[in-house]
């Protein structure tokens, strides 16, 4: 009898320490574990920002992994709205939305969305985008139905299957087969928000929609820390974030200790009944170009006045002129410190910046 082959898998939903006060995964350790698990690549999807992108890509290269740069955005109806009426029951309804860059254009569009989230959509500590921006900056981007905090799963959780289906159609119209149905399986989500629906119930609805619209299903783990034993320190991080006490029974916490960076074997066991959802992560992987984010540092070219042969000599002249004005006679200690600082600036090629 032929031995059954274990499905392949790459993580497409990962939070690092750059998901501020929410993620606890060190990028270097995450890359090491991905390599040890013989994964071909890994995604970066921090909350609302791409602060870790350069470090992420550099570390992936060290371990011969493909870096898949993305972001889990905060999606709202109107990014400009900052006033909400309690009397009318209004609140800032933020949904999670996972996006990945397929190529250089996609990376540039993700960067634009991130920037506009802060510039135009910042409310409290949340950089927010809306569908108006997505209509403008969606080229080169892959999207998923995301986690239970996303708009489509939330519609399902609250019993509005028609809304969920219409949202799926909106994404398909926008992205075609670059939109994927994402399913997750975390313990402790058997009765979400006390509404009598479980994460698995949500998954089954999503799978039915995927079949109806011929969409690929991908399996993910909402990774926020590296290993299972990191759940406890991560819980402390959440307390710092929310101001809650570790002893408070009613504070915000994750549903279980399963939000870690699982190995391929652990994911295969969790999704043994739908192995194609694991293999489909490679379908996403194959679509994504390997990003090269290294580039020369762009610094101003400062015009050098006559009598100086380089920015180095002119900066040195100005520094010593200023030091004499400030200190009068220069001691050996001051001279040594000035030369030390000037050497660092020169070695880095930052003379034009300081001038």
Residue ranges and their predicted role:
Residues 1-355:
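Phosphodiester-processing cores and adjacent nucleic acid-binding clamps
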């Amino acid at each position: 009898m032929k031995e059954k082959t274990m499905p392949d898998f790459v993580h497409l939903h990962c939070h690092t320490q750059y998901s501020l006060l929410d993620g606890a995964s060190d990028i270097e350790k995450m890359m090491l574990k991905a390599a040890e698990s013989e994964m071909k690549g890994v995604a970066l999807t921090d909350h609302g920002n791409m602060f870790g992108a350069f470090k992420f890509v550099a570390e992936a290269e060290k371990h011969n992994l493909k870096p898949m740069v993305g972001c889990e955005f905060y999606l709202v109806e109107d990014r400009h709205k900052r006033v909400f009426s309690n009397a009318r029951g209004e609140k800032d309804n933020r949904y999670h939305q996972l996006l990945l860059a397929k190529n250089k254009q996609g990376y540039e569009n993700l960067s634009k969305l991130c920037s506009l989230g802060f510039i135009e959509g910042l409310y409290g500590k949340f950089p927010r985008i809306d569908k108006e921006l997505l209509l403008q900056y969606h080229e080169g981007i892959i999207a998923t139905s995301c986690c239970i905090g996303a708009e489509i799963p939330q519609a399902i959780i609250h019993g509005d299957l028609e809304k969920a289906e219409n949202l799926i159609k909106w994404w398909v119209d926008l992205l075609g087969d670059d939109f994927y149905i994402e399913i997750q399986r975390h313990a402790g989500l058997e009765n979400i928000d006390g509404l009598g629906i479980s994460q698995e119930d949500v998954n089954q609805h999503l799978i039915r929609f995927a079949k109806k619209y011929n969409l690929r299903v991908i399996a993910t783990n909402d990774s926020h820390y590296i290993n299972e034993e990191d759940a406890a320190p991560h819980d402390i991080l959440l307390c710092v974030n929310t101001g809650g006490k570790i002893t408070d029974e009613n504070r915000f916490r994750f549903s279980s200790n399963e939000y870690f960076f699982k190995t391929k074997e652990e994911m295969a066991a969790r999704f043994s009944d739908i192995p194609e959802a694991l293999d489909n992560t490679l379908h996403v992987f194959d679509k994504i170009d390997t990003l090269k984010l290294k580039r020369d540092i762009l610094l101003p070219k400062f015009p050098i006045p006559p009598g100086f042969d380089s920015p180095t000599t002119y900066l040195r002249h100005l520094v010593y002129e200023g030091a004499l004005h400030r200190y009068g006679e220069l001691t050996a200690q001051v001279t040594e410190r000035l030369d030390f600082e000037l050497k660092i600036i020169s070695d880095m090629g930052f003379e034009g910046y300081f001038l």
